């Protein structure tokens, strides 16, 4: 980002949060006149002043960090898929598409957008709910319509004696509190004190360590712990991901960084139980983080165990910031994936055929479409797009 645009983007963030020029100046230890001049004259901002302003923003921001569920996989010990869909998820089963394929050994999938329910003829497999990132966001739209929270949904699941197979807790850094490249550097300098014995790092979409299957970020990505274990952390520069996907300028991204706590099996069970029991996201998330990792600053003459916490890390885990809250970001189901596929794989050929029809006076494309029979799957997807959330949910437990 160009030096002179930094204050423009910073001003936009300040105004979005609702912080006055005077409050920002006072918190940063600047005169109001000097700060106002920086903004109004779009002046170049020295690096030291930038740091003071950034630190002040963290302290003044009402929610510098938020917590989201970014992956939920739950196994229900039952073969009654209708009960799970209608009584637990509280969705109307008639709107779900059934597909004769599955994953993880399941043979059939009921789907509404990215919300997936998998079944198997084997009793020991039960019914599996799979919510990835977009699935979580879409399911939150249904929870909102039902006037339910994640806590209430999980309590309902627990009554079914479920097994939480995987849960990802995403701590979103909205203000650039974490410096991921610096944390990677600290890992290499042994300034990361952790129960885990391994870390892996990537930069600019390229490999720094060794090949990882789900590293698709332009910015820095850090894995702490083994991906084969039931608990590991993934830290990455989310703003770069949004730049690649949506073209969003780095400083304008809603989320700057993300710290993901990825939990499986008993670890996932324990985390959800703690969340539901206490409804204290700060305690649950940072209880896990603090138990397994901390970043320190090396001091000569002292043992590694005595090195002080790094100030940036100290702020992240709770000092000089407001308490972490569980939030939602509900999104409607869209045809984005289908439209992208159509745009890249079908549209060029379709356009060519339409032009040939136009120039040759034929109607091959129209004839093909007129004679195409929609399957039940396609009719249900049309219904999903035509119905409101309230039309597709069950408002009360049966």
Regions found by a protein language model. Name each.
Residues 1, 42, 52-53:
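N-terminal flexible/basic segments that precede or flank functional cores
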Residues 2-4, 16, 59-333, 338-398:
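Structured, helix-rich domain cores that form ligand/interaction pockets
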Residues 8-27, 328:
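Short basic helix-loop element that most often maps to the first helix and adjoining turn
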Residues 10, 24-25, 35-38, 335:
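Conserved hydrophobic/aromatic packing and binding residues within compact polymer-binding modules
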Residues 28-29, 39, 54, 339, ...:
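A general structural motif at alpha-helix termini
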Residues 29-45:
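Recognition helix of helix-turn-helix/homeodomain-like DNA-binding domains
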Residues 46-62:
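DNA major-groove recognition helix of helix-turn-helix/homeodomain DNA-binding modules
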């Amino acid at each position: 980002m160009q030096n002179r645009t930094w204050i423009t983007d910073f001003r936009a963030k300040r105004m979005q949060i609702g912080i006055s020029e005077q409050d920002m100046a006072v918190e940063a230890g600047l005169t109001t006149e000097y700060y106002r001049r920086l903004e109004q004259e779009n002046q170049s901002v020295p690096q030291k002043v930038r740091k003071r302003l950034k630190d002040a923003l963290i302290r003044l921001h009402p929610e510098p960090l938020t917590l989201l569920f970014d992956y939920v996989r739950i196994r229900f010990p039952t073969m009654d898929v209708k009960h799970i869909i209608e009584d637990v998820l509280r969705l109307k089963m008639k709107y779900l598409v059934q597909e004769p394929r599955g994953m993880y050994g399941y043979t059939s999938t009921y789907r509404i957008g990215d919300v997936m329910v998998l079944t198997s003829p084997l009793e020991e497999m039960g019914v599996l709910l799979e919510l990835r990132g977009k699935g979580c966001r879409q399911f939150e739209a249904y929870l909102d319509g039902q006037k339910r929270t994640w806590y209430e949904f999980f309590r309902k699941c627990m009554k079914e004696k479920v097994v939480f197979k995987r849960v990802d807790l995403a701590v979103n850094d909205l203000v650039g509190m974490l410096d991921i490249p610096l944390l990677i550097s600290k890992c290499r300098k042994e300034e990361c004190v952790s129960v885990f014995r391994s870390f892996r790092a990537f930069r600019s979409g390229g490999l720094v360590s060794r090949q990882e299957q789900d590293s698709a970020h332009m910015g820095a990505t850090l894995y702490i712990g083994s991906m084969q274990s039931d608990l590991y952390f993934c830290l990455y520069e989310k703003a770069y991901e949004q730049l690649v996907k949506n073209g969003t300028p780095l400083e304008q991204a809603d989320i700057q960084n993300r710290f993901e706590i990825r939990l499986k099996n008993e670890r996932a069970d324990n985390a959800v139980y703690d969340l539901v029991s206490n409804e204290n996201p700060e305690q649950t998330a940072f209880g896990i983080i603090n138990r397994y990792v901390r970043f320190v600053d090396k001091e000569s003459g002292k043992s590694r165990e005595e090195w002080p916490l790094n100030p940036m890390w100290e702020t992240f885990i709770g000092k000089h910031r407001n308490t972490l809250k569980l939030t939602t970001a509900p999104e409607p189901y869209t045809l984005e994936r289908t439209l992208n596929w159509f745009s890249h794989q079908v549209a060029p050929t379709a356009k060519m055929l339409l032009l040939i029809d136009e120039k040759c006076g034929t109607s091959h494309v129209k004839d093909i479409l007129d004679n195409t029979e929609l399957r039940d799957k396609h009719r249900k997807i049309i219904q999903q797009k035509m119905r409101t959330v309230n039309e597709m949910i069950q408002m009360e437990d049966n």
